[in-house]
Amino acid sequence: MPLLTARMLNALSIDVEDYFHVEAFATRVSPGDWITFIPRVEKNVSLILEILAKNETRATFFVLGWIAELFPKLVRQIAEAGHEIGCHGYAHQLIQRQSPEAFRKDVRMARQLLMDQVQKPVHCYRAPSFSITKATLWALDILEEEGFKIDSSIFPVRHDLYGMPESDRFPHWRNRILEFPPTTIRRANNNFGVAGGGYLRLLPYGITRWAIRQVNEVEEQPAMVYFHPWELDPEQPRIAAPFRSRFRHYTNLDGMQRKVECLLSDFRFGSVSEVCKCLTTIDPVTH
């Protein structure tokens, strides 16, 4: 599905959750504890909106339902700034820990909440921690039944928490859902994440820039970049957790804003739906 554009339009996405929601801290912080933490998501999203406005860039914000319920003005602020609202589920639970019935309830509640707040349809979904895997592909059928048109939950890499390395690396149809995976680069018969979250924080920016150029110019495909508001917040409270979890979460927070700004300067970005409409195929929202 190549793009019909001279200079590639890439997708920029933000997973709107707070620092205490992450899977890395799930053994230390239960959902019942969330309300006891000082939220920082409003401040961090406001910073992101300022950066995007300065660079005249639109993005898709995959908003957690729990966040939307507590901060409805924040969701409206994002939408009023011209950005697309996507759904990140309600309770940030891995899909493999949910029954199909529980998953349906979670996404239905979150999607309806978001649509009520912005008075627009919500077509895009991303699972917490990219947790649509080979074992949970049934979730795509539920997403279609619940009204979603685009999914960005299948990460074609090997990882201890997620991943489906055999999946297509670029936008493709899975039944009637358009799957738009996070960007990877393929080397030595393996796919490697390069353009989002911890990959973006940990890798030198030059590698990320080279990888996106390879995807755009050599493979002639759009990139999918993602990050979280807490990744631009080096002053966030520290949570006691095992070293591996702390390394994944806290490393290079102080350099993330600069990397995001460099990406916006070096590449063209739009929302997920904007990029999908540029694909040389029928518009997925009307497919």
Regions found by a protein language model. Give the residues of each.
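Metal-dependent polysaccharide deacetylase catalytic core of the NodB/CE4 family, i.e.
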Residues: 55-136, 148, 153-156, 181-184
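C-terminal domain-boundary segment and adjacent tail
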Residues: 2, 203-287
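The substrate-binding groove and active-site-proximal loops of carbohydrate-active enzymes
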Residues: 31-39, 62-64, 91-103, 128-131, ...
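Generic structural signal for well-ordered alpha-helices
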Residues: 45-49, 72-76, 104-111, 140, ...
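Distinct, well-ordered alpha-helical segments
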Residues: 25, 71-78, 136-141, 165-166, ...
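Active-site beta->alpha N-cap acidic-glycine motif
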Residues: 2-81
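Active-site-adjacent pocket scaffolds in enzyme catalytic domains
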Residues: 3-4, 116, 120-123, 127-226
